Design a protein with these regions (language model features):
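Short glycine/acidic-enriched loop and turn motifs that connect beta-strands
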Residues: 57, 91-95, 167-172, 211-215, ...
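Blade-level signature of beta-propeller repeat domains, shared across WD40, Kelch, NHL, RCC1
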Residues: 295-329
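Short loop/turn segments that connect beta-strands within beta-propeller blades
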Residues: 62-66, 102-106, 140-144, 181-185, ...
Length: 329
């Protein structure tokens, strides 16, 4: 009996040590995957470059050599990046305008017409889209031609397609996500269900937040199949009668086969934090856990996820860090 007791104690001790070891490995792996790369807001990522702003300067961080280049621009917000071009909203002159920065030559130009303090530019190739005063504009920076393409806000662009939110274009809908074809100049309504907003597009996939309840949920439309699915949960009730869902629509982004989003409530659907959703598998994975009511701004390119804290919800200077996670690690 004594030997049996000793063997049992040894076995329990071994299990405990293995358990502790696994916890340490897990903690080390998490620490290795998530890295602080700076302080500021509104990060965006393309290729090996991450861009963000602290309101005074634009930061351009190279993932290969880990260098941080700054571009002076007081009153900067909402930067975006594609290839070797940066674009952001600039209020350094006292009048809102869009700044366009060429990385190789370090030269800057401005778009000054039809820009307001709420303009948030998006860039793809040589084309930039933004909204001002409930109108959506397109600029081809290779020709300097600017065109009004719709009535609405929050546009995004992929190749020759632009998506945006509109409450006045579709006579059969109070609110809708619209899609504009640059080549044909034709428009279609992607969805008019619920309260859709902040659309994004990549390839044949259009995503948006339906914010009819609480912080909303994510839906996705495939232009090739003409099918719509829910990416995250609408407001629902769990087996214990508690509400869950409608907590994932505050900030969303898409690139290739991945959607990233912020979840701000601990409920039946999962813990709060930064998530990545795999379109092929239909599975969501928690990348970084946060307490409830923390509003992050994740963006994605290939296996790189970057995020900061939404500046509209920041409580102190401790909340303005920019983080990076390489999903391939």
């Amino acid at each position: 009996m004594k030997n049996k007791g000793k063997l049992c104690s040894i076995a329990l001790a071994s299990v405990f040590l293995v358990f502790v070891f696994l916890i340490l490995i897990s903690a080390a792996a998490s620490a290795a995957q998530v890295t602080k790369i700076g302080t500021g807001y509104d990060p965006a990522v393309y290729g090996n470059e991450v861009v963000w702003t602290n309101g005074v300067v634009i930061h351009l961080y190279n993932l290969t050599d880990r260098t941080d280049t700054t571009v002076s621009s007081s009153g900067a917000s909402s930067p975006d990046i594609y290839d070797n071009k940066l674009v952001w909203c600039d209020e350094s002159s006292g009048t809102p305008r869009l700044a366009v920065y060429d990385i190789p030559t370090a030269t800057k130009s401005y778009i000054t017409q039809n820009v307001d303090q709420y303009s948030k530019p998006a860039i793809y190739g040589n084309r930039i889209v933004w909204s001002a005063n409930d109108s959506v504009y397109l600029m081809d920076i290779s020709t300097s031609k600017q065109t009004k393409i719709g009535n609405g806000s929050n546009p995004d662009i992929y190749d020759t397609k632009v998506v945006y939110y509109s409450y006045s274009e579709d006579p059969e809908a109070d609110m809708a996500i619209r899609m504009y074809d640059i080549n044909t100049k034709e428009k279609i309504t992607v969805t008019s269900s619920g309260d859709p907003n902040i659309p994004h597009i990549w390839g044949t996939k259009v995503i948006w937040s339906d914010v009819y309840n609480h912080q909303g949920y994510i839906a996705m439309y495939d232009t090739s199949t003409k099918k719509t699915i829910d990416v995250t949960h609408q407001l629902d009730t769990d087996p214990n009668g508690n509400e869950y869902g409608a907590s994932t629509g505050t900030h969303i982004a898409i690139q290739n086969d991945k959607i990233v989003y912020n979840k701000c409530v601990d409920d039946y659907e999962g813990k709060p934090g930064v998530y990545v959703y795999n379109i092929s598998t239909g599975q969501s994975t928690l990348v970084y856990k946060y307490p409830e009511e923390v509003y992050t701004t994740p963006e994605v390119y290939d296996n790189i996820v970057v995020w900061g804290i939404d500046k509209n919800y920041v409580n102190s200077t401790d909340d303005n860090e920019i983080y990076l996670c390489n999903l391939a690690d």
